Amino acid sequence: MLASGSKGNATYVSDGSTSILIDAGLSGIEIQRRFDTNGLCPEDLDAIIVSHEHSDHIQGVGVLSRRFNIPVYISRKTKEASQHLGSIYDLRYFECGTAFNINNLLLHPFSISHDAVDPAGFTIEKSGTKIGIATDLGIATLMVKEHLKECALLILEANHDPD
């Protein structure tokens, strides 16, 4: 976890051969500093995945994508609502409910409760092991619980209050 909270979110996931960043909600310089502090290299990222359009999740996406030639995966609705994303090196779309691969990782995006256009949580699977990530989770709906069942690791940020 590189950052979590209303000032910025960024979660690094790697299996040793494929590395992804879920959200880049800090400046590109700050994310690069946090990578350096943790002995990581942003140029080794295979993808940046965007959960939703709020600035604390997308602030550094465009800069990192352009600087290190990193593909960005985002839903179409989130892209349309993202006013401060900037230009992207390689834009790829996903849809909640439809799994997709990044190299040897299988990602399952699913809808979550949050005050955004098309907010997504994710499970990431490899060789039968599954982890789950859901940020700004308002309500753990039955669908969310179903997706997060049997995760070996679960990362939840539940600071969104729908009321």
Walk through the language-model features, giving the residues of each:
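Active-site metal-binding motif and surrounding structural segment of the metallo-beta-lactamase
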Residues: I29-I74
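Active-site metal-binding loops of divalent metal-dependent hydrolases
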Residues: L2-A3, A24-L26, E53, I112-D115, ...
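Active-site neighborhood of phospho(di)ester-bond hydrolases with catalytic His/Asp-centered motifs
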Residues: I22-G25, L45-E53, Y73-R76, G132-T135, ...
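Alpha-helix C-terminal capping/helix-to-coil transition sites in glycosyltransferase folds
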Residues: D44, I102, K149-E150
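Metallo-beta-lactamase
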Residues: S75-G128
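Conserved beta-strand hairpin/beta-sheet module of binuclear metal-dependent hydrolase folds
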Residues: M1-N38, A120-D136
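Cap/insert and terminal regions of metallo-dependent hydrolase folds
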Residues: L142-D163
